[in-house]
Regions:
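Conserved core of the PLP fold type I
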Residues: 2-167, 174-193
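Short beta-strand/turn micro-motifs composed of small residues
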Residues: 75-77, 169, 203, 221
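Conserved core segment of the aminotransferase class I/II
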Residues: 191-233
């Protein structure tokens, strides 16, 4: 445990530590999440955050709220095993695509093929990517790869205007790979997203602050408009 985290926890009144928190989080929670993620309160996005029991709780919210019963979520073939369990527990399924191409880079083409297959038969499609520091491979997508992913998503959103696309980034290990500026560069690719698309971030403060057993996380919406952020909330 980081000494600064332990010091802060031990300085808190026991009543504050043990009492119920509001469903929407204590005052200042949304700003605190943004500062942890971006280093400041975002001016690029309309951001809303919902507290969850760790990153796992955020994943559950994404799968339950942004897929219909019987739908499949798309992700890579290298995954944290409980992704599949969470899907199946909530009446959803997991579809994967090969994570790496022949050049050992991220397989954008395989991702697009998987998305097209789901868009043909589902009204809602959820793409989940775990980066930086993918569990279990440790792979971090480059800025160029993330740019290509977002370009594909924008193209498909335009081709399927009656579908609802959700792009979910699981950044549970974002603070375990590279400098703050390097790891946050993945967010630079996310801009000018279409109206029929939602961008979510799975954030695990439990991991970032080295207190995994305390189960503190958030599902975060990065919206282009206030109306979209309010709808998420």
């Amino acid at each position: 445990v980081l000494p600064t985290v332990e010091k802060m926890l031990r300085s808190m009144p026991i009543e504050e530590m043990c009492s119920y928190a509001p469903i929407g989080g204590i005052p200042g929670f949304n700003e605190a999440v943004q500062i942890s993620l971006f280093g400041h309160v975002s001016e690029r996005f309309h951001v809303e955050s919902v507290p969850t029991p760790g990153g796992c709780g955020a994943l559950r919210h994404a799968i339950w709220n942004f897929l219909d019963n019987g739908d499949s979520m798309l992700t890579t073939d290298w995954i944290w095993g409980p992704y599949r369990n969470i899907c199946e527990e909530h009446g959803r399924f997991l579809k994967d695509f090969p994570m790496f191409n022949d050049q050992d880079g991220f397989n954008v083409e395989g991702m697009e093929d998987g998305l097209r297959e789901l868009l043909e038969k589902q009204k809602q499609v959820l793409l989940l990517l775990n980066t930086p520091a993918n569990n279990p491979t440790g792979y971090s997508m480059t800025k160029e790869e993330m740019d290509k992913v977002v370009d594909v998503l924008k193209k498909l959103a335009a081709e399927y205007p009656d579908r609802r696309l959700t792009f979910c980034l699981d950044v549970s290990y974002i603070d375990f790979d590279g400098t703050f500026e390097e790891t946050r560069s993945i967010f630079d690719s996310i801009h000018d997203m279409p109206e029929n698309m939602m961008t979510l971030v799975v954030f695990s403060m439990s991991k970032s602050y080295t207190m995994c057993g305390m189960r503190c996380g958030a599902i975060v919406c990065l919206a282009e408009t206030k109306e979209a952020a309010d709808l998420f909330k």
